[in-house]
Amino acid sequence: MSASPDQPADLVLSGGRIATMDPAHSWASALAVRDGRIATVGPDRAVMAHIGPRTRVIHLRGRTVTPGFQDAHVHPVHGGLARLRCELHDTRGREAYLAVIAAYAAAHPAEAWIRGGGWYMDDFPGGTPRREDLDAIAPDRPVFLTNRDGHGAWVNSRALELAGVTAETSDPADGRIERDADGSPTGTLHEGAMDLVGRYAPDDTPADLEAALVLGQAYLHSLGITAWQDAIIRPETEERAYVALASRGELTARVVGAMWWERHRGAEQIEEFVERRRVTSVGRYHATSVKLMMDGVLENFTGAMLEPYLDGHGGTTDNRGLLQIDPEGLSSWLSQLDAVGFQAHFHAIGDGAVRASLDAVAAARHANGPSDTRPHIAHIQVIHPEDVPRFRLLGVAANAQPYWACHEGQMDNLTIPFLGDRWRWQYPFRSLRAAGAVLAMGSDWSVSTPDPLLEMELAVERVADDSRGQKEPLLPEERLDLIDALAAFTTGSAYVNHLDGDTGTLEVGKLADLAVLDRDLFDRGAGAIGETRVVGTFVEGAAVFEDPALEG
């Protein structure tokens, strides 16, 4: 596989294992890059003719090179903000959280609000922390800390007081206030109830948002990620940051923006989306997707299920969760979005939300006929077995977050006991692939790690990286082979991002977006998949991340 070597290459990588991820899953040992595109892929000897006096040559010494990873569902602005604020993602346990929060409050006395997040529900009884713990640390300043999945918030009494949330406050239609027996708020807010307090927090400044995106982009590049789909784009926040960076030439990643569908509005949004797509597509940023939030999460019983949750002791309840968008309206709106070329990016956790999403796509197909909008459903935690083959039949990609597919506290204590036999329908990655679905992958960072290699390890092993050898795999029959997990983070996500014409594989003529790893990824004797590190990330042949070990 080679182009004419009339001009020397700008970059040559040789002596490695090049996972081209082309349709034949071909392997090579070297590649050459010229003018941002791949000029040659093949054996070392085929590349030698492309080396000139100014060619940068990197000797791989057996290390693996892959196409640049693409995250199909991520929140880099939020992830960057989390790293700039009270960051709890790397902390576990009530006492440890309180220590971090107290230290942050002491170090930032001028901040009007203490904001941040990353706490785990299973670190608290019933998954619900209390306001009194925060009151002891910050009685005079409002505290607003989201949990790791962003579907709940821990607040103090001052925040509730400022927002006027009391025992008399009704739950919003799309959320729930945790309460004591007398109706008083405990300090945990779920889903739409978070906005009862969050709306009073200071707006993020453009400078804050741009700094967060710069930080998030650098972090993702350090993990080999060269493209992503941002799963929530709002006009005054994320969109403004992307357009600012892209306009200055500082957006080095390729980004698809999924514009947020306001579930309290209707079809009038579509004309606004069309205009935003036109005026905000700058450089490597393109707003061509629309995010549809179908439900919540299982741990707080807001994930939409076809049948009710159990009560934890095997008894039935009347709670099927929250379907946040009316199915009848959704079918009409999705048909209109599809007709003007928008991709649908669904959040669907429960089997009821997954089915409603598939039904809406079916309605769009009936109304419009085939299209290349490539709808995808993110999270897909519980899928009714009858719906698995519908992904291929309807041309819907399965957008998986594999880091969640394991036994851990939230799974074992807050999910499985309330599902009954349906717990065996969770994260059916292998079944989806066997049924012919396109499988893409993402991290949902800052909900969980954005490291694609750790995510791939979970897809292959279905055991948490910190409990290897201690716990059984979650539904081991749904494990993927490593090559299929890698494909999901490269070719699959490139397909979802409509970037597969130029990226996703390492083939002659395609853009030289690639990741260099610190070892042979497929030599399982070299350590766990998740222990592999990225030492170099390139976009169009230009380094956007380099570890000293790249040349060492």
Where are the regions that the model predicts?
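Active-site neighborhood of phospho(di)ester-bond hydrolases with catalytic His/Asp-centered motifs
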Residues: 66-72, 378-379, 440-443
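Divalent metal-binding segments
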Residues: 3-15, 19, 23-272, 292-353, ...
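Acidic (Asp/Glu)-rich catalytic clusters
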Residues: 245-249, 276-282, 370, 392-393
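Non-cysteine beta-strand/loop elements that form the S-adenosyl-L-methionine
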Residues: 282-302, 396-406
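Glycine- and charge-enriched low-complexity intrinsically disordered segments
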Residues: 546-552
